[in-house]
């Protein structure tokens, strides 16, 4: 039987809908990827797992794009996820161009700056676990990315992402993240569980890696400050820390 043009178009549309819904349904939540819930008692994801999860999510969703922004002291790649609508992600270079023009009021005339501000998108940088023992932020980063791309949020994520590009760095200190998780896993379930490592959680600087922000000696600091002061000039920078026992 010969198909009519209308039937052919209908079948094509249905096929595209099925393919699109299949891609959305295939977005893997962190707990399924890790085999445990994020934040579950006595369970921590290390940097290798966190990086692998972001890579998987970027393969499954058109709302996230990954970049390598540098390397840690021990040569772990430092990743950053750009999260927004597919349309916004396709124009990242334009949004960067606008932030560069708006970064200094001496560079761009007022009228042009107003037009650029109207056209551009708000850039929000979120960095996690600068201090590696404050482990919750790096763990949370996976859930945050998943919730934003799937819209499983208490706010309208789709509406927000129309106007915002989120830059998410899941770990500011990948080496320290790995050290902390390896140490905890080694002694979990023993009388030493919860004890501090007998060494600093950065190859050189330990807790003082945040105090490197005026010297820029460490490659991790250089990677993040390059995003801040040379690459993106975000309007908001949220550095996630942690308090508690």
Model-derived features with residue positions:
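Mature N-terminal segment immediately following signal peptide/propeptide cleavage
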Residues: 27-82
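Bacterial N-terminal signal peptides
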Residues: 10-23
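Second-shell loop/turn segments in exported
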Residues: 37-44, 127-134, 210-214
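Surface-exposed loop and adjacent secondary-structure segments within mature catalytic domains
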Residues: 70, 79-85, 91-101, 112-121, ...
